[in-house]
């Protein structure tokens, strides 16, 4: 729980109707002028975006998506910037706390240039420029306080997706539930866990009457919110030619097809996260037992902006503790350190780009071997009659005998 005290609250004005700065507008108009894209729409309104380069196409994709569904793109920025408290109050600040404790934005700042390929950075930066160009052209969009959207906002979206699919959020919720129960009843929750996910079906010529290869993808996505599918076709002269579904704020197709291959994903929920029960020094709550010795937690302060009412917000300061295992979560009278696969990895963007540029089973599998996308079942089909199932999991190597 986030506790609010008068000494930790700063009352400030929230200017929700902030206008864009003229000097910034000039800067981002100049950036936008380096991209050229063509957007045409079919009878269903689906955008078909063409650009000479991948970056041009990404710029056009962002503009088309903003044209159709800017609300979901913009509201994702609350999450990507760890400002959900400004949208949902205390409940949103809990998500912000987790994102800030995990230092997701700091990792992106530190590793953006070294970990992301130059071609990938060009695409991400062009996509952010496309969103900003649409905002400039539509100044009454209601979300000018997010201008300018940056390339690092876009990367944060991919890192946070990894967080949500790592199982660490479910682990935290389970620890909170169990803290309210007698110990003998906690095992009941293990039997209540179940997997809900998506469907993908691939069939080749061995099972079809007309000797065709087909893939059917039904990913059970909502029509609104951060996981709402958006359908688009994006094509460039650099070999990018994908049509399918993507999330708000994503420059890459997540499930779909090109002229040679197609793939879909389903949720598989491998065991990717661990919680370490720490023994805290009864005489010093800022120490824990490590290899027979009491050692100090690393302690930092996290600032969480929270919407109050009208144009008012609070900034709450909360302590964050770190052990050698990872950030520490205090549940009731117990302290747990959290760790999960991919918690410091921002290379998901590289992998999605490589998959989008794949044109054969070999290329697609090579992209999947990156394993920066830490979970999902992959189902694949191609024009050469290949079908393939991949249980994808970036599972940690654990020492045997440890619970």
Question: What residues fall within each predicted segment?
Answer:
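C-terminal motif of bacterial Sec signal peptides marking the signal peptidase cleavage site
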Residues: 15-16
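Bacterial N-terminal signal peptides that target proteins for export
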Residues: 1-6
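Mature extracytoplasmic enzyme cores
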Residues: 21-403
